[in-house]
Amino acid sequence: MSVPAQTSVLIVGGGPAGSYAATVLAREGVDVVLLEAEKFPRYHIGESMLASIRFFLRFVELEEEFDRHGFEKKYGATFKITEKNPAYTDFAASLGEGGYSWNVVRSESDEIIFRYAGKCGAKTFDGTKVESLTFEPYPHEGFDESVHLANPGRPVSANWSRKDGSSGVIKFDYIIDGSGRNGLISTKYLKNRSFNQGLKNIANWTYWKGAKRFNVGEKNENSPLFEALKDGSGWVWAIPLHNDTISVGVVARQDAFFEKKKESGLSGEAFYKEYLKLAPQIKNELLRDATIVSDIKQATDWSYSASAYAGPNFRLIGDAGCFVDPYFSSGCHLAMTSALSASVSIQAVRRGQCDELTGAKWHTTKVAEGYTRFLLLVMTVQRQLRMKDKNIISTDEEEGFDMAFKKIQPVIQGVADTRTEDEQTQRRAAEAVDFSLESFEITPEKQAAVISKIERSQAEPELLEKLTPEEVHILGNIVNRTFEREKDELNLTHFTGDMIDGYSAKLEHGNIGLYKREKALLNGTASRAAAVLKSIHQVA
């Protein structure tokens, strides 16, 4: 089958974001073409999945296939941040007793979703790269950065090529950019990507065989382990996989990485092993009798965002729009959240439920808020990593970080985007984001000052090191209260509970889209909470 000359929705990129969007839309009867530059199976890092992945897969009836494939079951994750007891996020809190997600081999899991999109009716082509787009003028005053939108014109066609020398043009009504970090629209046409200066890291990783199982006989047996480096420069992941290997990677601040490399005079595998010594539990316990079975891989791990994730007839999803440090394994969660958002916002316009401006604004807001939730958490935990012995997210009395992680658990398991629309729970969440800290006798002025420092620290990371004890106290409570949620139903109905500009998502098979809501589920703090998230995101 050759790439058609025209389609209703063109999706660029066959990763989890693009393939999931193609699946959702194809199941709605939409004419979809999905183009992936590489040939499957292709390698990708990012093996640890959040609990929320089950909800997304369940929505498109793909959950059972993931189970049948035999991926390593993930019942939670363990975080060793300081010498205090490690914290464990138990997926039973969101998936029920015995509930699990997976650690996946991405070359396999990504291909499963890509092929499934084809089974659902999407026309899928791998080894087919989109080289450029053609735009037509789209005169509309509403599409501007003041509402986090962009207007380079309306994209109407794409030029593609294959390694066999063939090429062509495909016209479309809509385009969804899931091209990953290459970010076709964001980097080539909008030029609106900005990097978080406080989260410029480098990752080195490889795969081992013969590793010891973590914490045998305990509740968190064989869970992924994330251990802070002893020098405070970063962290190490250890993720067991179903092919009898374990993925082990070092994530370190770029400046610390190159300084240590220069001082040691080492490179490649020797330098990687030297850095691992700063994570003694992983190095001395899990890897004691293990051997490396792959080459050492390296990649920049810079967190970034964009000033807009949508415009006239286009949507950005997954890493094509934004990327946040992978400490909480948020990549595939954010990919599928944004893919679903793009799908419902496009269908809403196609079905006459709203105009294009409203649909685009709904999507860009949804993406920005999801990204910012993880950004705020990562920045705070990063400070705890750097300030090893100071209590940032725990108290002097606590022996570990279980209380802090219990409060942020709905976010780091992805449940904040997949829970039920219980009014009381949502109101409490909104009030928390509004930083209602009266019980700590913290004035609005002090709150604003700390938020300002957090914002500026993204351009001046050293500001995180200069917070006063009082500011540290305020920041810790902001984070804890921001993400204090309750356990609730196990489905995607929270996605429908969010109201943006008066519209909420409808996730009904055969009729997905947006609908006008007469009554908000949240009280007046919701808009202020959203404003805070947006304000932090703007400078990310």
From Swiss-Prot:
Q: Which terms are listed as keywords in the entry?
A: FAD, Flavoprotein, Glycoprotein, Monooxygenase, Oxidoreductase, Signal
The cross-references to InterPro entries, in alphabetical order and at most eight, read: FAD/NAD-bd_sf, Flavin-dep_Halogenase_NPB, Flavin_halogenase
Q: Which residues bind FAD?
A: 14, 17, 47
Recorded E.C. number(s)? 1.14.14.-
The entry summarizes the disruption phenotype as follows:
Abolishes completely the production of chloroisosulochrin and pestheic acid, whereas their non-chlorinated precursors, isosulochrin and RES-1214-1, still accumulate.
Signal peptide bounds = 1-21
Induction is noted as: The cluster is expressed in rice fermentation medium. Expression is correlated with the production of pestheic acid. Three regulators are located in the cluster (ptaR1, ptaR2 and ptaR3), suggesting that the production of pestheic acid is controlled by a complex regulatory mechanism.
Source taxon at top rank = Eukaryota
Q: Which top EC class applies here? A: oxidoreductase
Q: Which GO terms describe its biological process?
A: secondary metabolite biosynthetic process
Keyword Flavoprotein attributed = yes
Give the metabolic or biological pathway.
Secondary metabolite biosynthesis
Cross-referenced Pfam families: Trp_halogenase
Query: Glycosylation positions?
Result: 159, 192, 204, 243, 480, 491, 523
Q: Where does chloride bind?
A: 330-331
**Record bears the keyword Iron:** no
As one GO molecular function, the record gives: monooxygenase activity
Q: Its family?
A: Belongs to the flavin-dependent halogenase family.
The record's function comment reads:
Flavin-dependent halogenase; part of the gene cluster that mediates the biosynthesis of pestheic acid, a diphenyl ether which is a biosynthetic precursor of the unique chloropupukeananes. The biosynthesis initiates from condensation of acetate and malonate units catalyzed by the non-reducing PKS ptaA. As the ptaA protein is TE/CLC domain-deficient, hydrolysis and Claisen cyclization of the polyketide could be catalyzed by ptaB containing a beta-lactamase domain.
Protein name (database record):
Flavin-dependent halogenase ptaM
Lineage, opening ranks: Eukaryota, Fungi, Dikarya, Ascomycota, Pezizomycotina
Q: Give the gene symbol.
A: ptaM
